[in-house]
């Protein structure tokens, strides 16, 4: 599964099993709706391990991301992914990526939020 800015780098994308290219300026609501639909489709794959690249370049203040997500939207994205994995007993490995916000502290805060949300989701 890859959810990404359709017109963003790399311009020639290697296809994945499920690609969702979003238009420039996509907001929280549209992004999260697309993610919910995609997670339904991922259920059919039944992966043994989820490799989650929690990119923060969709953040509104990111200079290169071209999407328009808020901190809250990114946190909800993470929550949806982690809850999806937890409920299905799927182990998840988290990597961070992107992060070209101005100010850069926005990227740092978004990275930290991913791990805060993971801690909440997997706290036993």
Residue ranges with predicted function:
Residues 1-124:
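A general "terminal functional-core" signal
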């Amino acid at each position: 599964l890859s959810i990404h800015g359709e017109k963003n780098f790399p311009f020639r994308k290697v296809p994945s099993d499920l690609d969702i290219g979003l238009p420039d300026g996509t907001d929280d609501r549209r992004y999260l709706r697309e993610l919910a639909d995609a997670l339904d489709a991922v259920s059919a794959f039944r992966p043994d391990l989820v490799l989650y690249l929690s990119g923060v370049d969709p953040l509104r203040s990111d200079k290169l991301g071209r999407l328009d997500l808020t901190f809250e939207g990114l946190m909800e994205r993470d929550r949806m992914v982690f809850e999806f994995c937890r409920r299905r007993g799927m182990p998840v490995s988290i990597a961070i990526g992107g992060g070209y916000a101005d100010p850069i502290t926005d990227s740092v805060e978004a990275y930290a939020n991913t791990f805060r949300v993971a801690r909440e989701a997997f706290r036993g």
